[in-house]
A protein has these predicted regions:
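Aromatic-lined carbohydrate-binding/catalytic grooves of carbohydrate-active enzymes
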Residues: 161-294
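Terminal connector regions
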Residues: 136-167, 174
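A residue-level signal for beta-strand positions that form part of recognition/binding surfaces
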Residues: 85, 128, 167
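Short coil/turn motifs at secondary-structure junctions
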Residues: 4-7, 138-139, 255-257
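Polysaccharide-binding surfaces and accessory modules of carbohydrate-active proteins
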Residues: 1-101, 107, 117
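Short acidic, Pro/Gly- and aromatic-enriched capping/linker segments at domain boundaries
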Residues: 104-124
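Short, Φ-rich (hydrophobic/aromatic) sequence segments
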Residues: 84-90, 146-156, 294
Length: 294
């Protein structure tokens, strides 16, 4: 925690959550990288003198190309059931940075926290700024034990009802993509019931009328049922799910908008953008400024 008693706000520029100091003969770092549908590719390398940084500056998409956790084996490369292994992560969904520095004595320091890039924070007097928690576990029985320890901790202390039985669900996306109507969805619910599934989840494609959501190029932001697909609304689907004894879920992405939408036409100023810069689209969409009181 950081606080002060100056008369004016203090600008915080660099504030890590933790620093671990290790002394071992060798250090083997495992990191995970990838992309959509190609996630968590494993790379292990021995650390030598100097710095190795794992970080991201993508903000809300912080875990898209690099995962916010690491694995460190001591003395030897990592094994499943033997050897010393430390696994760490940070309780933070934005820009992060892990710095691994081996010095001239072959000692290792691991500094973890919010990425200082574009992260200046104005802290008023007598208020407290709390850095995100750094979570780690240590194993003498390899990465398998470390992984299980993290799973146990998450179930017992982090995840709501973490030890309850997990629900099974049927999501219509891979079955229909954007091409569905009320009857097709009810038919999928019937099949879900036969399988003993606990929940039916209605995915992307159920909304917008002026620009119906028939692809990812339009409709995002217009949160009303598409009359051509769901003439009786989402309520009819909920009723059908209740009759069949299954739960009903629905997909929504309220923070995003397509340029081809009624919302964008009426409130273009609600979109986050940089002055004098062209709009940038990812999956044909942009981010809404949820801090805008309008």
């Amino acid at each position: 925690e950081i606080s002060h008693e100056e008369k004016k706000p203090v600008i915080l520029c660099k504030y890590a959550s933790s620093m671990l100091h290790l002394n071992s003969s060798k250090y083997f770092l495992t990191e995970f990288s990838g992309d959509w549908a190609h996630e968590a590719n494993v790379t292990e390398r021995e650390l030598a003198f100097g710095k190795k940084v794992i970080d991201t500056k993508l903000g809300a998409r912080a875990n898209m190309f690099v995962s916010p956790f690491f694995q460190l084996a001591l003395d030897n490369s990592s094994q499943e059931n033997a050897g010393e292994v430390l696994v760490g992560t940070i309780g933070w969904t934005g820009n992060f940075r892990f710095t691994f520095e081996v010095d001239n004595k072959n000692e290792l320091r691991i500094i973890s926290g919010i990425n200082p890039y574009d992260s200046e924070y104005s802290l008023p007097a007598k208020e407290v700024f709390r850095t995100p928690d750094f979570y780690f576990t240590y194993s003498t029985q390899g990465k398998g034990e470390a992984s299980r320890s993290f799973h146990d901790w998450a179930r017992n202390h982090q995840v709501k009802n973490g030890n309850d039985t997990r629900m099974t669900l049927l999501n219509n996306w891979e079955s229909t993509y954007f091409d569905f109507d009320e009857n097709k969805l009810i038919g999928l619910m019937d099949e879900a019931t036969k399988l003993g599934v606990d929940m039916f989840l209605l995915d992307d494609g159920w909304f917008a009328n002026k620009y119906p959501r028939s692809s990812d190029h339009q409709g995002l932001g217009d949160w009303e049922e598409t009359a051509g697909k769901l003439p009786n609304g989402v309520g009819r689907l909920v009723e059908e799910a209740q009759k069949k004894g299954i739960k009903f879920g629905i997909w929504i992405e309220p923070e995003m908008v397509n340029p081809k939408s009624e919302l964008y036409e009426k409130h273009k100023d609600w979109v986050i953008h940089l002055p004098n810069r062209d709009e940038y689209y990812f999956r044909n969409q942009m981010v809404l400024d949820l801090s805008n009181p309008k």
